[in-house]
């Protein structure tokens, strides 16, 4: 075989690359396994503490992520932000046990971070699929106009105030401001529903309006996220582009639901005919992944597809079985997303002792104010409904919870948010999640005392 003497022989180079890759692969796996141990330990510890404090476990998962991430223990780190392998305690452990060179350590750090990031993205896809399953379109239609008014006002008001305020008052660039404004839109169904159930108000008129509006809020919020995410990809803000994205996102959800209803009998028939274990879960996950793929290739967010899949399958007779079967899968993947969001959040950028950080704190305070006011006003838009506890409806729409974290996670991953704005959104989510439950209880209990008839004062004989 003819070989050019001026060119270096390729085989030794290829062999060296293969050997290096072969040596690194087990270490990448070891790094992923150690990272998952850290993630699950942090999520369970934080979740258990919050549950005992009568707070949503998801908040504990977020705080657990903050503790093990870049802000504190540095057990779970990612290359974003210029972090080096030596900064990660997990990589330090691997370097000490395997005598890694700096180049090999960088390769392991990058590869294991990519794997964890992919698992995190799968977690948010499954989370939105689960939220879609829990959304009852028929119930939403029943509460109808009142829930729609609350939802639309609850999306438009905080989004407009947040975006315009960040751009005009703080001079934030358009796309980060739009992303932060979008993070103010969605309401956490789970947190509000839990509080309403605890105080026996879930079936009340106010409770039904809140839940119906929260469901519609989620749909509108995910559409807003898809539109904003697409704006980040294109890098352009044009009215025609925004209108196209809104129409395409709305059309995708509506079209998916309509087509899904036509194909639902085939889905049920297929699942019933299959005899192997896990047929319902795997077929359903395939539906979610296919719609996520379609959403992704048409320049929308993958989570919009999984959410639409959940809405579709929630209308079938398999809903209850699927809700039960999806739980173990969600328990495995979803905590990875929340802990990673917390781990990537550098709360040191909000340290008031550093003068340069004070603007970030002011932005956080501004977002918290808009997040609360923008939702409280929603109840008072129901004109002519004096019998309703309008303040309770508004307060019930305050908590952002997991949906707000989805916005923060997607925004940070896409590079649309700088560390200070990302941390400000995280603080907003934490504060609204803390504030809403006790306030909602107090509002309903106060109304109950006012409704109680006064006892007659006994007259002396």
Swiss-Prot record:
It is a multi-pass membrane protein. The gene is nhaS3. This is High-affinity Na(+)/H(+) antiporter NhaS3. Induction: Induced in response to increased CO(2) concentrations. Expression is under circadian control. Gene3D superfamilies: 1.20.1530.20. One of its GO terms (molecular function) is antiporter activity. It is found in: Cellular thylakoid membrane. GO terms for biological process: proton transmembrane transport; sodium ion transport.
